[in-house]
């Protein structure tokens, strides 16, 4: 079964090659029970490692059941170990966080023999029962005695039905009674199952149990003694014939990947505090991404809602200073006749209304309130702002505008501050000392682009605010670009002409958002012609889309800055993950060697550690999503900034976190996958 021809193994020590095996030629028949003996440094352990394909010979040939092991590639060697070799180690090499059943099932992860998980569980259970541990399936290694742990190691070695069982000092850490039990188990496996057994030992009693003893000295076979003829039934050796190496199981198959995820979670739980601290950078980075995206999405939504509430087709015309056709500089005034001209002569204009602003204090009984905005206008303005359908009452009429009637309409906020839950219609309030009757309450609008309350407003006829409210205090408008107020006028009980009164702005609604630019051009031409001025600088015409663009650019800039900071945090988190994964590779070097010994190839090891890094980042990502959402809600409430949840935010965050795990976990995973199995098993 085993043929060794001139097998050599040299180790490089400094500038020199140190020969350990100096040309071993040895044949071992199928079903033989062989003991390898020799003093320390004789080469017996090195020979066992070569037999188990854990190490590569420097020279010579090694055939097992007709397979030229010396010529196999690393991938084929992994499949060879999985299919043909079983290992029993002196120190057991059990996974500390896995149950007895899971430890025995470890080789099946890397096997490609077609067994289902249920079949693997059944086989592992039978093996544990056969070694006397049927009642210990769910026990952890630290809950078992040394003999029980070695029995688990033997059951694990038999899990893939190997042709060759290699045992390195299997009784070295056991008491005398347990040693005899293990030796009896070896004899049973050899005689009843026909397994070829090679045991490395210093103990003469252990060697006495073998059919054949091979003594080594100075890297050569010094003595080869057959103690007794093999008693194995030759009919049981039929299955020991060579089988073609099966295609290795895919490292990324669903069962293998799921097992890797489970192992990753167990490994991360092993050092919970270190895991949390490692994830902190990812958590902060993802939380920054989520909060930034939600706050910016909320701001964008607020901008859109404000544009919709104020009108995407809205323009405001304010006076400026310009040169007349004669070349003289003079201030420009806007009068109600200009409003009429704009409405009648500009085909792109749907609605035009005058605007008069005031700074006022409102008083009702013992309640006082200063609204954000006190505005005089006409009913056309209310219609353009979708305020013609009031929550309570009715809009003021054109007749009331002409009469400068003492009426007003309150926003929801003002109505609440002055009347609380009382019915306000028909009640009287004082506006800068002028008594006005409440005729309506506006429907709720909410905050504007920058968070100002659009419902903190009082609206009345522009004539009322111009001739009564503003004149009552001698106040001037709050806008420096407006002309000085005209002297207060004696109000008459009859209607009077107000078409030459100065107003502060003109509110215009274009026929559609597409007509805004045309409306701007037409308005400039009409007003410049009416006032005999050059168009440049005479009027400032603004539309809400310009304001929205500016605010949007500011929000975009702040969001970009936040995302840059989040990216830096993710980079720091990624470096931390790389560091901790390198530490994990070092701590689990023996585990890596064990997995390779039972059939794991480089791709499987790479997958294992890559998944661990990814799991670390994805878990941190989910925590970051929750933390980021809570942070954005908190910030929004504290500073009054709107927030909006986005389905893309968590998707982007998890994707970025997983990418960080893959990118920064690749180097540690690659480092683990390139370890030499024998070096990994020897690592202390």
From Swiss-Prot:
Pfam families: ABC_tran, FtsX, MacB_PCD. Its EC number is 7.6.2.-. It is a multi-pass membrane protein. ATP binds at residues 38-45. CDD domains: ABC_MJ0796_LolCDE_FtsE. It is an enzyme of class 7 (translocase). InterPro entries: AAA+_ATPase, ABC3_permease_C, ABC_transporter-like_ATP-bd, ABC_transporter-like_CS, MacB-like_ATP-bd, MacB_PCD, Macrolide_Exporter_MacB, P-loop_NTPase. The keyword Transport applies. PROSITE patterns: ABC_TRANSPORTER_1, ABC_TRANSPORTER_2, MACB. Homodimer. This is Macrolide export ATP-binding/permease protein MacB. It comes from Rhodopirellula baltica (strain DSM 10527 / NCIMB 13988 / SH1). The gene is macB.
């Amino acid at each position: 079964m085993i043929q060794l021809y001139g097998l050599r193994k040299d180790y490089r020590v400094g500038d020199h090659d140190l020969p350990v095996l100096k040309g071993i030629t040895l044949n071992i028949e199928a079903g033989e029970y062989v003991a390898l003996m020799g003093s320390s440094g004789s080469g017996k352990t090195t020979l066992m490692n070569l037999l188990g394909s854990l190490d590569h010979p420097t020279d010579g040939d090694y055939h097992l059941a007709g397979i030229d092991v010396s010529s196999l590639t690393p991938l084929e060697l992994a499949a060879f170990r999985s299919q043909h070799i079983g290992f029993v180690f002196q120190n057991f090499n059990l996974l500390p966080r896995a149950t007895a059943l899971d430890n025995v099932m470890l080789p099946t992860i890397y096997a490609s023999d077609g067994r289902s998980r249920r079949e693997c569980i059944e086989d592992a259970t039978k093996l544990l029962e056969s070694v006397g541990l049927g009642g210990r399936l769910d026990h952890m290694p630290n809950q078992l005695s040394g003999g029980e742990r070695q029995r688990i190691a033997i059951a694990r070695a038999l899990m893939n039905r190997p042709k060759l069982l290699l045992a390195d000092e299997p009784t070295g850490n056991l008491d005398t009674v347990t040693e005899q039990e293990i030796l009896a188990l070896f004899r049973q496996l050899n005689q009843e199952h026909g397994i070829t057994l090679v045991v490395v030992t210093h103990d003469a009693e252990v060697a006495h149990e073998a059919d054949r003893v091979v003594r080594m000295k100075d890297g050569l076979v010094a003595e080869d003694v057959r103690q007794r003829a093999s008693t194995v039934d030759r009919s049981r050796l039929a299955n020991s014939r060579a089988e073609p190496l099966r295609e290795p199981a895919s490292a990324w198959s669903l069962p293998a990947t799921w097992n890797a995820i489970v192992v990753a979670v167990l490994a991360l739980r092993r050092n919970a505090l270190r895991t949390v601290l490692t994830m902190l950078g990812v958590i902060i980075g993802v939380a920054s991404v989520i909060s930034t995206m939600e706050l910016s999405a909320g701001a964008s939504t607020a901008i859109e809602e404000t544009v919709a509430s104020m009108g995407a087709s809205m323009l405001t015309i304010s006076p400026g200073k310009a040169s007349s056709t004669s070349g003289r500089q003079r201030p420009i005034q806007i009068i109600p006749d200009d409003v009429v001209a704009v409405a009648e002569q500009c085909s792109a204009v749907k609605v035009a209304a005058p605007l008069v602003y005031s700074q006022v204090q409102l008083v009702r009984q013992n309640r006082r309130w200063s609204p954000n905005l006190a505005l005089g206008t006409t009913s056309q303005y209310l219609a353009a702002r979708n305020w013609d359908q009031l929550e309570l009452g009715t809009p003021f009429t054109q007749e009331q505008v002409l009469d400068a009637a003492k009426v007003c309409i309150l926003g929801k906020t003002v109505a609440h501050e002055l009347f609380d839950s009382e019915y306000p219609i028909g009640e009287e309030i004082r506006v800068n000392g002028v008594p006005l009757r409440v005729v309506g309450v506006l429907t709720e609008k909410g905050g504007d682009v920058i968070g100002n309350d659009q419902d903190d407003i009082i609206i009345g006829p522009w004539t009322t605010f111009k001739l009564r409210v503003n004149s009552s205090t001698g106040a001037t408008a709050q806008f420096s670009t407006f002309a000085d107020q005209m002297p207060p006028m004696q109000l008459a009980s009859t209607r009077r002409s107000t078409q030459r009164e100065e107003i502060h702005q003109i509110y215009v609604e274009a026929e559609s958002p597409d007509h805004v630019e045309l409306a701007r051009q037409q308005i400039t031409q009409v007003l410049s012609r009416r006032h005999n001025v050059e168009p440049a600088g005479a009027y400032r015409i603004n539309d809400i889309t310009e304001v929205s663009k500016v605010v949007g650019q500011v929000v975009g800039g702040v969001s970009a800055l936040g995302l840059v900071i989040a990216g830096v945090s993710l980079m720091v988190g990624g470096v931390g993950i790389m560091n901790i994964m390198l530490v994990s590779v070092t701590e689990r070097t023996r585990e890596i060697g064990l997995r390779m010994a039972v059939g794991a190839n480089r791709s499987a090891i790479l997958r294992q550690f890559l998944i661990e890094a990814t799991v670390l980042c994805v878990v941190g990502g989910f925590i970051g999503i929750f933390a980021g959402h809570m942070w954005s809600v908190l910030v929004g409430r504290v500073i009054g900034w709107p927030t909006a949840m986005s389905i893309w935010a968590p998707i982007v965050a998890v994707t970025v976190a997983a990418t960080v795990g893959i990118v920064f976990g690749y180097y540690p995973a690659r480092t683990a996958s390139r370890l030499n199995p024998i070096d990994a098993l020897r690592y202390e």
